[in-house]
Regions:
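RNA pseudouridine synthases
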Residues: 1-121, 130-134, 141-220
Length: 220
């Protein structure tokens, strides 16, 4: 049976079926159909949309940069990047002697809602200069659930959510990119692959994609 599955991977779960001695959880506990495997990966400390399939062709189709297949990430970072920093991300960052491919990077505005954030916490939107705000794109209506365990905030350091749209996926690439411009990533979610969005798929849940949803993934 040929299937393509969308899975909302929780924090602390490996993108593999066995733990190999790791303290993290593995995919085996989520009772996927037999003979499926993850297409690409998300680090254990990253969350969001992960695809699985028993059809090998999806791997090359979605992962090879020559197909320019988009993946969208939301990254919660320390401090508020300047327009120059966002432009630097978009043009490419040198990481370990290799420059990343050009991408899209923007400040999400309004900022995504996290259900357990205290109302008294200062909104990142209030920290934006007019010049920086001009680079903002609308965030989707996705409400982000709290992470378990929660991230550690530094009260003296503001944070905000960035959107990044990449066509490549090197090891810990988004985290290394934001760190290179002085904005360490606190939390990272993949919210879209091709035209398929994470939307309301609950954390830790998966679904077999319909024919129409498969077309969204493929960008058809």
């Amino acid at each position: 049976m040929v299937v393509l599955i969308a899975f909302n991977k929780p924090f602390g779960v490996l993108s593999q079926f066995t733990g190999d001695g790791s303290p993290n959880r593995a995919l085996a506990e989520f009772q996927f159909p037999k003979n499926v495997y993850p297409i690409g990966r998300l680090d254990a400390d990253s969350e969001g949309l992960l695809l699985l399939s028993d059809e090998p062709a999806w791997n090359e189709r979605l992962l090879h940069p020559r197909h320019a297949h988009e993946r969208e990430y939301w990254a919660q970072v320390e401090r508020i990047p300047t327009p120059e920093s966002l432009q630097q991300l978009g043009l490419g960052i040198s990481i370990q002697g290799r420059k990343t491919l050009p991408c899209r990077a923007w400040l999400l505005e309004p900022q995504p809602e996290v259900s357990n954030v205290a109302a008294s916490r200062q909104s990142a939107a209030n920290c934006l200069s007019e010049e920086t705000a001009a680079l903002c794109r609308d965030a989707a209506t996705l409400t982000i659930p709290p992470r378990v365990p929660p991230i550690r905030f530094r009260k003296s350091v503001p944070d905000c959510w960035l959107g990044l749209e990449l066509i490549e996926g090197k090891n810990r690439q988004v985290r290394r990119m934001t760190a290179a411009i002085g904005h360490p990533t606190l939390r990272l979610l993949r919210v879209r692959i091709g035209g398929l969005k994470l939307d309301d798929l609950a954390v830790g849940k998966w679904k077999i994609l319909s024919a129409e949803e498969r077309k969204l993934v493929a960008g058809e």
